[in-house]
Amino acid sequence: MKKRDTFYITILFILPILFVLCVSTYSMYGSKLDWLSQHISLADYFRQTQQLLPDSFENLQGQTNAFSFSYYGLLRPDVLVSYLFPNIPIHFFIIGYATLLWSSTGGLCYCWLRNKGYKDSIRFFSSICCICANCFFQSHQQIMFVEILPFLFLSLILIDS
């Protein structure tokens, strides 16, 4: 990897983090409707049970099976890591995980385009367009449908190699 590639990937990794930090100074990065009412409150309840895979949740929907809530991230990586740190609020993990995935998408897009043989300027501009896309604007509203993009670029890199 060239020195210029490392510089571009570093810029692509830092830009989303700076955006989240700028937004977070005045409010929380995330939607109060989707994040707070669903993902944060349910992930916090999952942690309060102190079980990795409980059979059921006694206080939710009349003792419903735990896998009924898999849509809300029962076994998401950020929720699993948050089990190790019960004193840290869950919204820090969810914001950090969303930011990490958003940041890594730009770098993975750049690497995929580099493997395809595009010029440096085209790779960098395309990766900037990727991290500024509308779906990442929505990442502060909904987290479930945007988290797949870095894994998409990673799979494209692996398929091409």
Question: Where are the model-predicted features located?
Answer:
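Start-transfer (signal-anchor) and selected internal transmembrane alpha helices
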Residues: 1-22
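Membrane-interface transmembrane helices that cradle and orient dolichyl/undecaprenyl
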Residues: 155-161
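Membrane-interface coil-to-helix junctions
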Residues: 16-105, 130-149
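Extended basic-aromatic, gly/pro-enriched interface segments that bind polyanionic ligands
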Residues: 152
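Transmembrane-helix signature of polytopic, membrane-embedded enzymes
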Residues: 110-132
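Transmembrane helix-loop junction
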Residues: 83, 114-115, 161
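Membrane-interface starts of transmembrane alpha-helices
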Residues: 4, 85-94, 119-126
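Transmembrane alpha-helix boundary and packing residues in multipass membrane permease domains
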Residues: 79, 107-111, 157
